[in-house]
Amino acid sequence: MGLPLPLLLLLLLPPPLPRALPAPASARGRQLPGRLGCLFEDGLCGSLETCVNDGVFGRCQKVPALDTYRYEVSPGALLHLRIILQKLSRTGFTWQDDYTQRVIAQELSNLPKAYLWHEEASSPARSLQQNADNEKWFSLESEVALAKTLRRYLPYLELLSQAPTANAHPRIDHETRPVKGEDSSPENILTYVAHTSALTYPPATRVKYPDNLLRPLSRLQPDELSPKVDSDIDKQKLIAALGAYTAQRPPGENDPEPRYLVHSPMRAPRPFAAPALSQRWPLPPGDSKDSLSMGDDTLLRSLLKDLQQQAEVDRLGSLKLEEQADSIAGAIQSDPVEGSQESHGRGAEGQLREQADAPEEMLQDHRLPEVDDPAAYKEVSRLSFKLGDLLKDHGSPLLPEAPLLEKSSRAEMKKSEQPEEVLSSEEETAGVEHVKSRTYSKDLLERKPNSEPQPWRLEDQFQNRAPEVWEDEQNLKLAAQGPPSGGLQLEVQPSEEEQQGYILTGNNPLSPEKGKQLMDEVAHLLRVPSSFFADVKVLGPAVIFKVSANIQNMTTADVTKAAVDNKDELEKATGLTILQSGIRPKGKLKLLPHPEEQEDSTKFIVLTFLSIACILAVLLASSLAYCLRHNSHYKLKEKLSGLGADPSADATEAYQELCRQRMAVRPQDHSEGPHTSRINSVSSQLSDGPMPSPSARSSTSSWSEEPAQSNMDISTGHMILAYMEDHLKNKNRLEKEWEALCAYQAEPDSSLVAQREENAPKNRSLAVLTYDHSRILLKSENSHSNSDYINASPIMDHDPRNPAYIATQGPLPATVADFWQMVWESGCAVIVMLTPLSENGVRQCHHYWPDEGSNVYHVYEVNLVSEHIWCQDFLVRSFYLKNLQTNETRTVTQFHFLSWYDQGVPSSTRSLLDFRRKVNKCYRGRSCPIIVHCSDGAGRSGTYVLIDMVLNKMAKGAKEIDIAATLEHLRDQRPGMVQTKEQFEFALTAVAEEVNAILKALPQ
């Protein structure tokens, strides 16, 4: 089952509206009858239901699906449905919700419907096996309705008038002989009685199709009969009616086929075709040979009485009615009819539908009884046409098609949808009759009279048939005078006044002036006046028009085809872009092929080149900025790396010039002492100048932030420059200084506690043991091992009471709880980790934090809050540390530097300095120590502490800085701090680079 075109267009459009409250849970998922949307979502229909394609969303119907129809969706309605679906979707409703079903059903109720023939009606097996399957298609209700109708109206047949009157239907030529081979047998006996009676009914209210399509005839009351009728029964007319009724059915015992004479719409609510232009009311047969005798009159009254008694039975079957009709026919037909008496004229579509639904033998012509009273049959003929005219004009309920007259605007919808393949083989070879032009195909006249169309093809032919508009009197007369045919039925094209053409443009919305200009150009192109087009309207980007009646016999299809063929000329004349043109019969679009739009590739080429140019410009600018920045850093690195080689007078002169400029603007009362010798004592560093508060020790040390906050004087920078010059003049100075540092021996250096047997498993390296006088003491009562030992040393800076750092080894699996206990008891908030977890398969540090969630280490619960990777060199983790004994919680931040390996140095000083700035920015304003650890807590940890301590002294405004003396101060508190000469040289380079950045940031 393919999706309809309007729905495909609806899904391609883009989607905004306030979100409403979601539907209650009770409103979801309930199986309701007739649910919509089964084409788009499975499971909507119940087990006894099937999904019927209604042309929009699909509707669930009980099996068998009888009420089949399609909606006619105009472009405006399609846009409205799209907006409704957007609202429901954004609000959270689905097809399962009752609210969705009610909203969509309400919207669809406003759309016009086109009723379809039942899908099984076109099955050849059904038509060929009518006798075996008819019990499946007719319910007992139709038989009861027939019996009640006979019981109500047969007594009133005695009111038929006997007096012949003048021809009451002058519009139709009654003397015209019926077309040979046509079947005029009515659908049932009631239709024949209605056609041959002079009953008149008040105008029936036009009821909505198809609810009252099969309105019971019993609604008419006896007092509705016209008082004009006489009180006596016209026996000849009743005889003719009953005779024709019985004659139309093939004889045979136990023949159930007369059931097909009951209205076929009882099978399924199919759309009935309104009486076509060529339809004529059936005529009784012509002159009969024998007249009725008085015995026949008596017999007739007796049979009518028996028939009325039979009608009293509520469950009277149609087979019994046929038996009664056989009895009447047997009494009438005293002599067989000789010669071929052909059936008289038939309706255009209703009779052909009988041929399609009836078995094959029902397509043959049947003879009607002949009576020898020509006057009686003449009167029957006159009354028949008069009654037919009255029923047509007043919409009698006897005609199921009457309610359809007010919906004549749907006449073209099914016709436009019918593909050429669905047409019967007769129409493919015989051609099509045009009602207005009265032209007939030559091939049709040459067809053999006995050719029998295939019943299933005939049903397919009329499956998409829609009710026609009744023409004026002249057209009705012409339609009644159709040419003879051999039992075939011509397809009638819809009238041109009912077709709408459209031209779709690229302007949305299209102004009415532009639309009128476009139609004027089309009229000029066709060499017709502007009045040639009627009812010109602009709908969105399209112009909709109708083609008036014209002597050129030009149709809407001709106009739309001309618009397609001359598309370029129209676009040039109007300045519009024509996208499509086609025929629009009442909301359904029949598109015509037209040349595809040739996309202007020039604009895409221009846009492509512009995009490429922009991308290249951005890349070029980025590359230039990177090169400039990299070049400046490269030059600085070259200067620093050449300190031990060829001396550079440029660097020295630059630093000295900066110093002179800085000194020139200083107050005159400030005097500096001579810098003639280096200070080697630790006491001179610790006692120099007033000390700021402990909270001021933190420094961001950033090239953009730290110099602005630094208290370092230009003279300090000059001192650092002089220190570097001293190393440059004496190439072996750095190595000798390192040898002196290696020979330095701390006093005291006792490590008895760390060497105890119970503490030996807690040491990662025997070369780095804590001094007894400088170690972190844990509270043994809170320790899981009841010990106060951990391999960690406090590092003092300027305040011997408050350590600035805690240098410790990387935790072992057995010391993780001790590590977190030290973090808690020291009040630490920042951890600096300078080692990866493993190097070349050697474990450097235990994974002492959870990867996700939380872990408990003794009485401390560590919860990982976040983990951010700042760059490829380091990342930052945030923890919640909770003491399960006191239920207190603190926040701890870990800075993990990844690219510094054991006994080595980082690849660049820049990455470590940037890492230090991040650490100090987080630490700013705190007075707690920073825990620094690597693997053994000495080499990499000592280098980092040395760099940070020297730079912090410079930021506080220290007048004298001695890096070697500072390292000795660190080794007094923990052995092995800065383990290699490369690490010491790296510390000097990092300090020099940071000083250089500070000097550049100072105001000139």
From Swiss-Prot:
Binding of substrate occurs at: 902, 934-940, 979
Membrane-side (Cytoplasmic) residue stretches: 625-1004
GO CC terms: endoplasmic reticulum lumen; presynapse; receptor complex; secretory granule; secretory granule membrane; synapse; synaptic vesicle membrane; terminal bouton
**Pfam families membership:** Receptor_IA-2, Y_phosphatase
Please report, in chain numbering, the residue ranges of the motif Tyrosine-based internalization motif.
Answer: 655-664
Bias (Basic and acidic residues) ranges = 341-356, 407-418, 431-450
Q: Where is the composition biased (Acidic residues)?
A: 419-430
Q: Name one GO molecular function term.
A: protein tyrosine phosphatase activity
Reading the lineage from the top rank, the first entry is Eukaryota
Task: Tell me where the sequence motif Leucine-based sorting signal sits in this chain.
Answer: 993-999
Active site at 934
Compositionally biased tracts (Polar residues): 677-687
Function text:
Plays a role in vesicle-mediated secretory processes. Required for normal accumulation of secretory vesicles in hippocampus, pituitary and pancreatic islets. Required for the accumulation of normal levels of insulin-containing vesicles and preventing their degradation. Plays a role in insulin secretion in response to glucose stimuli. Required for normal accumulation of the neurotransmitters norepinephrine, dopamine and serotonin in the brain.
UniProt free text on domains:
The tyrosine-based internalization signal is proposed to function at the level of clathrin-mediated endocytosis and recycling.
Q: Which PANTHER family match?
A: IA-2 PROTEIN TYROSINE PHOSPHATASE, ISOFORM C, RECEPTOR-TYPE TYROSINE-PROTEIN PHOSPHATASE N2
Query: Which protein is depicted?
Result: Receptor-type tyrosine-protein phosphatase N2
Gene that produces this protein: Ptprn2
